[in-house]
Amino acid sequence: MIKLEQICRYVWINGDLIPYQFARIHVLTHSLHYSGSVFEGERAYNGKVFKLKEHTERLIQSAEALGLKVPYSVDEIIKAHEFLITHNNIKDAYIRPLIWCGDESLNITNPALSTNFLIASIPSMPMSCEQGVNLHVSRWRKAMPDSTPVQSKSAAQYNMAITSKKEAKALGYDDALLLDYEGFIAECTTTNIFFVKDTTLYTPIADRFLNGITRKTIIEIAKNLCLEVKEERLKLAQIEYFTGCFVTGTAIEVQNISSIDLGDKKILFEDCKIADLLKKEYLRIVRG
């Protein structure tokens, strides 16, 4: 396995460019103990970050939802990205901006806590799987939207996703399908899900989970290709009537789903034509 120190030269922290091996935080960092950090996952294609403004605006909104004050403007954050990409000399990169609280206090809240900002970039790694992905339905449910800021991309939101994926992997699956608190289909652990029937896409309403930037892009592409898109509450019992299924995300882009195991039966998806068409158009757009 390649270590990050082998592929990441510099990290941008609080306005300074720091060699990877010297980028450190204290063990008593507040966000390390209380999951009080927010982040983004971004992709650069040929040196240009796709939808960087949208990612940056969402990052700031995520921080504000947790009461974190971001000391940089959208334009300053964009320039920091460009600065880091140039110095790391990586054209196709996965980029991780992160905002977190410092180590001034371990109290749950304290006005003395500092807000810190990091941007890291590493070469993009192949994430998609040509033969498709097999899903297991997780026993864990997404939280109610009035119990946590679901549109905030915060570290705390990923605890259940990590647990669900670990359990799915241990059972021999590739990933987990997550349901919301009412038992409707929500998303996968780090991706948004779509189903296909003829020339119509079906996808859960994004009010109970993070509305992905790639998800929104794919919906826009689909409509431009004269495909119908229906956003609605979807039950597990409905999925056997769909012929195709795929997921979307910044890292994975567009990935076909081969099967979803419901426990009493496994639903197979063999129609990849729509997903392949959308992926082809998506890659054309991001690579400009």
Swiss-Prot record:
Q: Which pathway does the record list? A: Amino-acid biosynthesis; L-isoleucine biosynthesis; L-isoleucine from 2-oxobutanoate: step 4/4; Amino-acid biosynthesis; L-leucine biosynthesis; L-leucine from 3-methyl-2-oxobutanoate: step 4/4; Amino-acid biosynthesis; L-valine biosynthesis; L-valine from pyruvate: step 4/4
What does the entry give for GO biological process? isoleucine biosynthetic process; L-leucine biosynthetic process; L-valine biosynthetic process
MF terms (GO), sorted A to Z: L-isoleucine-2-oxoglutarate transaminase activity; L-leucine-2-oxoglutarate transaminase activity; L-valine-2-oxoglutarate transaminase activity
> PROSITE patterns, alphabetically?
AA_TRANSFER_CLASS_4
Which GO CC terms are listed, alphabetically?
Answer: cytosol
Essential cofactor(s): pyridoxal 5'-phosphate
Under catalytic activity, the entry for this protein gives: L-leucine + 2-oxoglutarate = 4-methyl-2-oxopentanoate + L-glutamate; L-isoleucine + 2-oxoglutarate = (S)-3-methyl-2-oxopentanoate + L-glutamate; L-valine + 2-oxoglutarate = 3-methyl-2-oxobutanoate + L-glutamate
Q: Which UniProt keywords apply?
A: Amino-acid biosynthesis, Aminotransferase, Branched-chain amino acid biosynthesis, Pyridoxal phosphate, Transferase
- Do you know which InterPro entries this protein is assigned to? Aminotrans_IV, Aminotrans_IV_CS, Aminotransferase-like, BCAT-like_C, BCAT-like_N, BCAT_family, Class-IV_PLP-Dep_Aminotrnsfr
Pfam families named among the record's database cross-references: Aminotran_4
Which EC number(s) are documented for this chain? 2.6.1.42
> Into which family does the record put it?
Belongs to the class-IV pyridoxal-phosphate-dependent aminotransferase family.
Q: Tell me, in a sentence or two, what this protein's role is.
A: Acts on leucine, isoleucine and valine.
- Protein name as annotated: Probable branched-chain-amino-acid aminotransferase
Please give the organism. Answer: Rickettsia typhi (strain ATCC VR-144 / Wilmington)
